[in-house]
Design a protein with these regions (language model features):
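Alpha-helical transmembrane segments and immediately membrane-proximal extracytoplasmic
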Residues: 1-424
Length: 424
């Protein structure tokens, strides 16, 4: 009796295994995003709402930020420079053909600590490292997963970003939009289909856990549909220019704070960042945290701010974000950058057109798109990220602003060397 399997059956079996494993990766990514955001929500509720309501400690914000920063500094001195951002993780995958997965619990704790003390960073850093690490663990321990480990890691990172930002196509373009060759490879074959399977599983698990146990972060609020007037189109150049100025400021301060941080010994640099964060948060609480919830508040109360005050907040938010990232209170930059772009857009639109809702929404969209385009150099990813925040009719204008930003800002911050904690 001939037990030899036909090539067709073997190919079908391999394809099914690929689809099932990608669905599993997506489900794990969705669950991890939910766990991180839930712990973050419970922790911040306790530290910043429940505990202050039960005590009357003077300078509470400064105390929590400094004490938390000291803990983070000691943690990083013991375990290393975590969390790593998406670009660092994927660069290691490209250069080393693998990613170390032995420190996944450390990555999770390192990602959570800055978020709990109100650091001006987003939650995406750390998540991608954990997901990619799990994929390489599977490649080392599961025979059928070994040959596709890099693809699995890219899909896992993309799904985690998409679920986190509630933007289905953002993750895949953020991971893949590095060159025209990458985009061409993405549109050929079955990679988009496989990503769709993983995304469906991740979104389903995240939605299910949120329905059963409550969600953590709710994602950026969506702006209402507005009428775009001729004046708005004429002001596009001004809004794009403002976004470019912010992008240049972000990149310049990223490099500057990185150079300054290297002069501080371990733990001291984190404490310094915590002190700056606490002082800034005491005077202007909107500067703390990622900016996701703060933007919802801003959408309702922006008319109570002077336009120049909103513009100032945009610059201070970017400066504080870079200070936190480079001085050890690390996290992602997407949420704070979007918040800064919206503040600048609101401020400029109010200066030129008054506080009318339609004008300020359009201004916020164009400034934010130009700003993100200048930082990320990925106009498609920027468009997909902002697609669910702003009205659909702005889609093409957002893409144009992001494309202009990605081409005109050339100051690229160099990768700052990680602090060597073992010698300090």
């Amino acid at each position: 009796m001939n037990n030899t399997k036909s090539p067709k059956n073997v190919s079908l079996k391999n394809q099914l295994e690929l689809w099932l494993f990608c669905a599993l990766i997506g489900a794990v990514a969705g669950a991890l995003v939910w766990i991180l955001l839930k712990i973050m929500a419970v922790g911040t509720e306790f530290l910043w709402k429940w505990l202050p309501g039960k005590t009357s400690v003077p300078y509470y914000t400064i105390l929590i930020c400094v004490a938390g920063a000291a803990i983070i500094g000691i943690f990083r001195k013991i375990f290393g420079d975590y969390p790593e951002d998406l670009e660092t993780v994927m660069e290691k995958v490209r250069a080393e053909k693998r990613y170390e997965y032995k420190n996944m619990l450390v990555m999770m704790v390192a990602a959570l600590l800055p978020l709990l003390i109100g650091s001006s960073v987003g939650p995406e850093a750390g998540l991608t490292g954990i997901i990619v690490g799990l994929c390489y663990w599977a490649g080392d321990n599961l025979k059928f997963a070994k040959q596709n480990t890099r693809n699995y890691s890219q899909i896992g990172a993309a799904v985690s970003m998409s679920v986190l930002f509630h933007a289905p196509l953002f993750g895949i373009f953020e991971v893949e939009e590095n060159s025209e060759e990458d985009l061409a490879a993405l549109t050929k074959g079955s990679k988009l289909f496989i990503y769709g399977i993983a995304l469906a599983a991740g979104t389903g698990i995240y939605a299910g856990l949120s329905a059963l146990f409550g969600a953590g972060l709710s994602g950026f609020p969506s702006f209402d549909m507005v009428e775009i007037q001729r004046k708005d189109y004429l002001l596009m150049i001004l809004y794009i220019l403002c976004g470019l100025i912010l992008a240049y400021f972000y990149q310049a301060t990223h490099k500057l704070t990185g150079n300054i941080s290297n002069r501080f010994p371990a733990v001291v640099r984190e404490i310094f960042a915590g002190l700056c964060l606490g002082i800034a948060g005491s005077f202007l609480p909107a500067l703390m945290f990622s900016g996701e919830e703060q933007m919802g508040t801003l959408m309702k109360t922006y008319t109570s701010y002077l336009p120049l005050a909103l513009i100032g907040i945009a610059f201070f938010k970017l400066l504080l974000t870079n200070l936190c990232i480079q001085f050890g209170l690390k996290g992602g930059h997407f949420f704070p950058v979007i918040f800064a772009g919206v503040c600048m857009g609101y401020g400029m639109a109010m200066l030129t057109c008054g506080p009318d809702g339609g004008h300020v929404v359009f201004g916020a969209a164009i400034v934010t798109a130009s700003l993100l385009g200048g930082i990320m150099k990925k106009p498609l990813a920027v468009t997909m990220l902002l697609f669910l925040c702003f009205p659909v009719k702005m889609f093409i204008w957002i893409f144009i602003a992001a494309a202009v930003g990605s081409k005109l800002i050339t100051l690229k911050p160099e990768q700052e060397p990680s602090a060597d904690y073992s010698r300090q």
